[in-house]
Amino acid sequence: MIEVYTDGSCLGNPGTGGWAFLILNDGGITNHFGYQLDTTNNQMELTAAINALEFIKENDEITLFTDSVYVKNGITSWITNWKKNNWKNSQKKEVKNKDLWIKLDILNSQKKIIWKWVKAHDINDHNNRVDLLAREAAEKLIKSSFD
């Protein structure tokens, strides 16, 4: 079984954002992070999950931990109605971040994933680590733009 922790961060919303993931597999730990200009927190949360799932090549069962209720509920519940309603939400408006949701949905259908929500800024060391990495990625981008 593979465990994945993901997080996204945004300095301003919209603003400069960072994403990170951490993968625990066979006793090893891998983490990656990145950043983006002019983004939102939700886009970074989705990007973290997408990049983590794209990184994993094995067909093992994955437990993905996110502190984003938006990502967890979106992929496990809301997306069913969005697809039925041609990517419209309950207010009949276009689903925000549709392009990212489509990517995540494809990855979700290709892998065996258990989605779990974890409380942010709490006692989970792995979640705290990806939170820090995502924030640092966004902060580095801002710092580099002033150098």
Residues covered by each model-derived region:
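RNase H catalytic domain
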Residues: 6-16, 51-129, 133
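RNase H-like nuclease fold core
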Residues: 1-43, 47, 54-60, 132, ...
